[in-house]
Swiss-Prot record:
SUPFAM superfamilies: SurE-like (SSF64167)
Gene expressing this chain: surE
The enzyme's E.C. designation: 3.1.3.5
UniProt: a divalent metal cation binding residues: 8-9, 40, 92
UniProt keyword annotation of Aminoacyl-tRNA synthetase present: no
Cofactor: a divalent metal cation
Family as reported in the entry's similarity comment: Belongs to the SurE nucleotidase family.
Cofactor-binding details, from the entry: Binds 1 divalent metal cation per subunit.
Organism: Xanthomonas campestris pv. campestris (strain ATCC 33913 / DSM 3586 / NCPPB 528 / LMG 568 / P 25)
Function noted in UniProt: Nucleotidase that shows phosphatase activity on nucleoside 5'-monophosphates.
PANTHER family in the record: 5'-NUCLEOTIDASE SURE (PTHR30457), 5'_3'-NUCLEOTIDASE SURE (PTHR30457:SF12)
Protein name: 5'-nucleotidase SurE
Superkingdom of origin organism: Bacteria
Length: 259
């Protein structure tokens, strides 16, 4: 298969290099199109106000001065001279569990691939303090998942969000299909003073686990399993349509009121 590989940790990150090499050893044709620096937390942002510069590192690697979504969007809308068969994003050097997917550039790169018509997988290694020990485990999981998708494709609107415990392959207990868990609200932002005495802020840490019981991605990884969560682009909360329709009915009088 022709595999487009991207990430949000940057083109030089060890995770993406190990992933690309594992896919090549498995017989796939791999093209890496990734940010030229760390763009973690970029979510689905596109660069629209300035042109996007690219730099070919070699025949199979392109660095992009943009977001993960920019990378996949450019690759699938004309930058490459061929059409990839699948998008694989990662390997992220930290978890993308629960609410993390809202902010994750790793997941968003996969989401852009799915939005533009390709099967897509986001792969993250659940590390402690970004100290990764077993990227090879996540890479092998990715290779196995890509092979399975080739043999038995999933429905067209499905993105696979994969989180791998930082264990040796022999110590992984299996694959587990999960739903997204939830975290408590984020920790407070962190104010500091710059050298001129002005206040600056750092975004605070992610909140602790809240909904993390059996069946969630948090629980699967914590118990030594590879979590596979099917997600999709459509954010509509269908269960709330009738409730909100009744609620909107209460706004009708506002249309008849004088301005």
């Amino acid at each position: 298969m022709r595999v487009l590989v991207s990430n949000d940790d940057g083109v030089d990150a060890p995770g993406i290099q190990i992933l690309a090499e594992a896919l090549r050893r498995a017989g796939h044709e791999v093209m890496v199109v990734a940010p030229d620096r760390d763009r973690s937390g970029a979510s689905n942002s596109l660069t629209l106000d300035v042109p996007i510069r690219t730099r070919r590192i070699d025949a199979q690697t392109c660095a992009v001065a943009g977001t993960p979504t920019d990378c996949v969007h450019l690759a699938l809308t004309g930058m490459l001279d061929y059409d990839p068969d699948i998008v694989v994003s990662g390997i992220n050097n930290s978890a993308n569990l629960g609410d993390d997917v809202i902010y994750s550039g790793t997941v968003s790169a996969a989401m852009e691939g799915r939005f533009l018509g390709l099967p897509a997988v986001a792969v993250s290694l659940v590390t402690q303090n970004h100290e990764a020990h077993h990227f090879e485990t996540a890479a092998r999981a990715a290779v196995e998942i890509v092979a399975r998708l080739k043999a038995d494709p999933l429905p067209a609107d499905t993105i696979l969000n994969v989180n791998v415990p930082d264990l040796a392959w022999a110590d992984v207990l299996g694959f587990e299909v999960t739903r997204l868990g939830n975290r408590h609200r984020s920790e407070p932002c962190v104010p500091q003073n710059d050298p001129r005495g002005r206040t600056v802020y750092w975004i605070g840490p992610a909140g602790p686990e809240q909904d993390a019981g059996a069946g969630t991605d948090f629980h699967a990884v914590r118990t030594g399993h590879i979590s596979i969560t099917p997600i999709h682009v459509d954010l509509t909360r269908y269960q709330a349509l009738d409730t909100v329709a009744g609620w909107v009915g209460g706004l009708t009088a506002a249309l008849d009121a004088p301005a």
